Structures are given as structure tokens and as C-alpha cells.
A protein has these predicted regions:
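Active-site beta->alpha loop and helix N-cap motifs at the rims of alpha/beta catalytic domains
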Residues: 18-91
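Catalytic alpha/beta core domains of metabolic enzymes, predominantly
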Residues: 75-179
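Residue-level "edge-of-site" marker
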Residues: 1, 38, 118
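Glycine-rich, proline-tolerant flexible connector loops at the mouths of alpha/beta enzymes
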Residues: 1-19, 86, 143-144
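Active-site glycine- and acidic-residue-rich loops that bind
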Residues: 10-13, 41-59, 113-122, 171-178
Length: 179
């Protein structure tokens, strides 16, 4: 969702609740899928003085990152399955935070949609399934063309597809010209 005053992305549970209630009140038969990716943004200072982190850093714990999911109870929520450089910033998702977020989703009976931005994210997703943290059927979204994750060329796409277990349900998207 976006902050109506600034137009910037927001993780306010009240804004998510307003949107999900509007959708449900419309009686439209759709599956609601909310992001759980916000709250993991690390923005470093200048190259020669990266600390302290810049005020635009938005890094909070697993419970706060999942608060809108707890309150809104969508059918699905995303789980960004790893840390990566994201343009000039860092999207930080440690294994322990991801395990905690997945447990919260499971406790709320919300289906997890894994978001894999690179091949290492697939590797960790398989580990979460092996540990029983992510339930069948496993849903995974391949997120292509995000700077500096997996490029959106056919070879990289096929490498990722070929690493998805046959019993998982996958989809994919790209940003930019290959969208």
C-alpha cells in the first residue's frame, strides 16, 4: 500500500486493513496476497562512512513486519526468501527472521508465497520446506530483473525453473523491458 499523503510505500497495518476491507466488502471473488517484504531495507551512508545508517533505513523485527498480515488475514502473503543488494540499498532477510515470519504466517493460516530473487533464495526455500516450515503445495514466484538479483534473460530464468521441485507451483515476473 501507499501512504495517501506522500504516495510513498507504507507498511501501516491500518492502511492494509482499509484496503483489504474494501476488497472484501466489494464481494469480489479474489485471492488477497499481501507483501511481507517491507521492513527489511538497509540504507548505508556514504561509501567511505557507511555508518550510521541513513534515516531512510526501514529495518524492523519479524513480528512488526507481519503485523498487517496478522490483522488482515489475507489468503496469501509473500516471503522474500533471502538478502540481496537492491539497487544501491540492501534488502535484509536473515534466515532466522524468515523462519519467524513463516511461523507467524502459518499460525495465522495464511499461505506463503515464496519470492525468489536469485538462485540462493531457491536453495533456502528448499531448506524451509525440508524443515516443514513451508507447507505443501509450495507456491513460488520468480522475481526477475530486479537490480541486483537474477537478470531476466532466458538462461537465468531456465536455471531457476530447473531448480524448482516438480511438485511446486511457480510463476514469474520481470520488471522493465522484458516485463
Amino acid at each position: 500500500v501507499r501512504d495517501p499523503d506522500t504516495g510513498e510505500p507504507a507498511r501501516s497495518p491500518a492502511l492494509y486493513k482499509e484496503v483489504t476491507e474494501r476488497i472484501r466488502d466489494s464481494k469480489t471473488d479474489v485471492i488477497i496476497n499481501l507483501t511481507a517484504g517491507m521492513g527489511g531495507d538497509v540504507v548505508f551512508g556514504p561509501i567511505e562512512a557507511p555508518l550510521p545508517l541513513l534515516p531512510t533505513t526501514d529495518m524492523v523485527g519479524a513480528s512488526e513486519r507481519m503485523q498487517h498480515v496478522i490483522e488482515c488475514r489475507p489468503e496469501i502473503c509473500t516471503l522474500d526468501c533471502g538478502t540481496m543488494n537492491f539497487a544501491d540499498d540492501v534488502m535484509a532477510n536473515t534466515p532466522s527472521i524468515l523462519r519467524s515470519m513463516a511461523k507467524i504466517a502459518n499460525d495465522c493460516d495464511v499461505r506463503i508465497e515464496i519470492e525468489a530473487f536469485d538462485t540462493g533464495h531457491l536453495w533456502f526455500a528448499k531448506q524451509l520446506v525440508k524443515e516443514g516450515i513451508i507447507r505443501d503445495p509450495v507456491l513460488i514466484q520468480l522475481c526477475m530483473g530486479i537490480p541486483w538479483g537474477a537478470p531476466d534473460d532466458l538462461n537465468t530464468f531456465m536455471a531457476m525453473v530447473n531448480n524448482i521441485p516438480n511438485d511446486w507451483v511457480f510463476s514469474a515476473f520481470s520488471i522493465g523491458k522484458n516485463q
